[in-house]
Regions:
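Active-site segments that bind and position negatively charged phosphate/pyrophosphate groups
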Residues: 1-62
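C-terminal charged capping/lid subdomain of soluble metabolic enzymes
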Residues: 37-110
Length: 110
């Protein structure tokens, strides 16, 4: 969901697909932490792993409102809600569609 918004907002020209996915993974972990699905230790391990391989460009600048609106164009959006597949502990995910706009905007880290 996050990666598709990144790719669409940049017209697939600024970041590779892998970079967009890695950036999106960090955002998903941010949301998961804010929602209480993962603890700080697991969150930090995941972020450190992504950053260790230097696959998520830093310093990306997006308009948060445009980014949020773009997420509703994703194939996972249904009935006016954005569905997120979020980490929920080791080797586990949860699918949610009840994240508030504030939670999502905060998760962007922009």
């Amino acid at each position: 969901t996050y990666a598709h918004a990144i790719e669409n907002l940049t017209n697939y020209t600024v970041y590779t697909h892998g970079e967009a996915v890695a950036m999106g993974m960090k955002m998903a972990f941010n949301l998961s932490l804010k929602r209480g699905f993962v603890d700080n230790n697991y969150y930090n391990q995941a972020i450190e792993l992504i950053e260790h391989y230097d696959i998520a460009p830093k310093g990306a600048v997006f308009d948060k409102e445009k980014f949020y609106d773009e997420m509703f164009l994703d194939k996972k959006a249904q009935d006016g809600k954005v569905r997120f597949v979020l980490p929920n502990g080791h080797y586990s995910v949860v699918i949610v569609s009840d994240s508030s706009k504030e939670q999502v905007l905060d998760s962007l880290g922009l």
